[in-house]
């Protein structure tokens, strides 16, 4: 395509985020940021604004058919939150503190811009770039310092080690099994008594046509048939950048935490023991608990000694680097939390509507 010697950046998350974090050219950061944030919002055949309108309309109709005045009331009744007021009360309680912290972080970022002679206030495409600089200035920590200690194969050993220590379960790779991609791996999970618990797939790298982000799903849910347990087939899916041939896959600290997080979901599914899966779900707002718990094992000293080893020398990650990583880990929570809260408010505001206006403007809502 005449692009020999050039770098190609796609609008996949693992390509966009490092670019926004490290690219020095502000105009290019702006270009990729706007392209990324406006996916599905370009007034063309792939525009999703009308789809959003159709979704909220169909959901309200479904709720009415079930006897509820809006979709949020219908969904929340079966969740721990129970009602709309409890959700808004929680969001309203967190918002002021998160916003105050985000403003502090913004001040740090604008200070970094001025330090470099910039005569402008931070925009969306500046945030990650200058946030990385502010973080490095505060904690003397470069994310790339940690990557050599988080080689993907070692991280996988770490999650299996935790599961074995806590629950006595083991994971053995299965070679002769269909897989969604040649780079995906499959493992048989056995309980401490040697009985078959299930199969775990791990699909690590981004590729064309693959959904973005990371999640845990399944090809088969656990159930019972004719009195016998049908074991689950669970999948954890990630979108890490695939390394060049012959090179190791080195993860960031955040990506490492993501592996532990999704593995927590996988354990939840593998340990499942219900007769009627479709009516045996936990409340939706409980679902993240097992994964949130599991991700904390990523920085436990005993666990780090097992998996956080330099991919070339085998040296265990220095404690001083771990301490800086933990301290810096909370930096940026203001921005991250306000982003989550804003999405939560938007979600609730759509789904408490009692009527959907014919002229609903998705961009202004």
What function would you assign to each model-found segment?
Residues 3, 13, 42, 46:
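Substrate/cofactor-recognition hotspot
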Residues 37, 241-244, 264, 268-275, ...:
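Hydrophobic alpha-helix feature that most strongly marks membrane-spanning transmembrane helices
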Residues 1-10, 53, 58, 64-239, ...:
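Active-site-proximal, well-structured secondary-structure segments within enzyme catalytic domains
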Residues 272-294, 299:
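The catalytic-center signature of Zn2+-dependent metalloproteases
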């Amino acid at each position: 395509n005449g692009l020999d010697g050039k770098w190609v950046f796609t609008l996949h998350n693992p390509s966009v985020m490092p670019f926004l974090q490290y690219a020095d050219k502000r105009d290019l950061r702006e270009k990729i940021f706007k392209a990324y944030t406006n996916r599905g919002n370009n007034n063309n055949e792939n525009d999703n604004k009308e789809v959003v309108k159709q979704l909220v309309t169909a959901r309200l109709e479904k709720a009415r058919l079930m006897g509820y005045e809006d979709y949020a009331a219908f969904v929340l009744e079966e969740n721990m939150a129970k009602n709309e007021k409890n959700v808004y009360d929680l969001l309203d309680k967190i918002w002021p503190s998160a916003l105050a912290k985000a403003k502090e972080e913004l001040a740090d970022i604008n200070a970094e811009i001025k330090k470099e002679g910039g005569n402008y206030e931070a925009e969306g495409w500046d945030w990650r770039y200058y946030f990385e600089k502010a973080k490095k200035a505060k904690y003397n920590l470069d994310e790339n310092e940690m990557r050599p200690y988080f080689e993907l194969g070692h991280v996988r050993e770490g999650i299996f080690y935790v599961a074995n220590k806590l629950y006595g379960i083991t994971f053995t790779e299965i070679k002769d099994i269909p897989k969604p991609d040649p780079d995906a791996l499959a493992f048989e999970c056995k309980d401490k008594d040697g009985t078959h618990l299930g199969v775990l797939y791990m699909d690590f790298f981004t590729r064309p046509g693959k959904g973005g982000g990371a999640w845990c799903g399944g090809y088969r849910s656990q159930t019972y048939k004719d009195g016998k347990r049908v074991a689950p087939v669970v999948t954890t899916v990630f979108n890490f950048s695939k390394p060049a041939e012959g090179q190791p896959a080195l993860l960031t600290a955040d990506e490492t935490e993501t592996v532990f997080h999704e593995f927590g979901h996988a354990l939840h599914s593998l340990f499942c023991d219900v007769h009627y899966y479709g009516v045996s779900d936990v409340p939706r707002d409980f679902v993240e608990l097992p994964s949130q718990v599991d991700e904390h094992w990523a920085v436990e000293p005993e666990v780090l000694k097992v998996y956080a080893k330099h991919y070339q020398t085998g040296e265990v990650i220095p404690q001083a680097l771990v301490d800086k990583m933990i301290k810096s880990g909370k930096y940026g929570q203001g921005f991250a939390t306000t982003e989550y809260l804003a999405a939560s408010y938007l979600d609730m505001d759509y789904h408490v509507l009692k009527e959907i206006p014919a002229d609903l403007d998705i961009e202004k809502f």
